[in-house]
Amino acid sequence: MNISMILKNDSFVHTANLNSNPLYDLLIDLQETKEILINLGDKTYRNDRLYMAQFSSGVELYKILFDKEHQKEAGITGEEVKMLNKVIEQNSSIENDEYDKIVNDIIQKQVNEPYALLCFYLTNTLPYHANTPNTLLNVRRELLLLTNDLQDFVTACPFCFPNLQFHPDLVNTLRGLSAPFKKYKFEIIRHLAAINDIFHPLYKENQNGGINENLKVLKAEGELSCSLEGNAESARKRLTFQFKNNLDIDEEVVCEPHTKLEGTNQPGDTEYRYDRIYFHGGKENIANGKTLIAHIGGHL
């Protein structure tokens, strides 16, 4: 799923820099974020009222971009001006009315299309706001909730969880969930985010260590239930999946660790459920060591 991000005008106002972050560091983060968007085929937009934002005290952004005297007074280097110009100029234009509607919808949390806001200064974590690669990941996961089609969901997952490799049969396993995907998707995304952000780095650091210790951390920090199978021999029979290795050869992998989808966490749905996400910590010869997501669906 491709997304569209719009530069947020008031995030370029100097008073928004509550943490006094260095200009160069902010530009590096924003430039890297934009490059990720471009490389993935996403769209970025600019509303031209942005040029009137008070980027420095009493000085509009357009003066900073195009007037060397104002650049000097603001203490902005030539390299920083080039970076700032690149961030602002290399976007499609969006009209005032459309910009205002999108920003209002996002602030009101009434997002129905894959739009979000690309910010310069971003002090607090806000839904659908990003200014770094990490906050962009959060935005992608928030927008993933708009997806109800299983194939679209699976196709979008690698962009939202870059540390994970997904089995090609996931669309079929998702059909076996004990509740409709539309009800379950928030909880599934929460579990995948925990495996991507918490479990995968732990496993990469200590592949030869105890998997149980990694699962304990995943359980505590991810606030979810997870474990190995009780019978290892039975697990080998039931939980062996094939993944393509780096030689494009199918390789069997036992995906015994699993998180427990014990409920949809939807209001009014109190039913205890037995769905699972089965995975493997990863092998260097398969998808460059990403954690392998083998099954999202019913208990196997």
Model-derived regions: residue spans:
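Generic structural motif recognizing short loop/turn segments at the entrances and edges of beta-strands
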Residues: 1, 112-118, 124, 133, ...
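Preference for solvent-exposed, low-hydrophobicity sequence contexts
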Residues: 1-162
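Arginine residue identity/basic-tract feature
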Residues: 46-49, 140-141, 175, 185, ...
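Short, structured coil/loop segments at alpha-helix boundaries
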Residues: 67, 73-84, 181-185, 245-248, ...
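Long, positively charged binding patches that form subdomain-scale interaction surfaces
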Residues: 150-268
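Compact beta-sheet-dominated globular domain cores
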Residues: 272-300
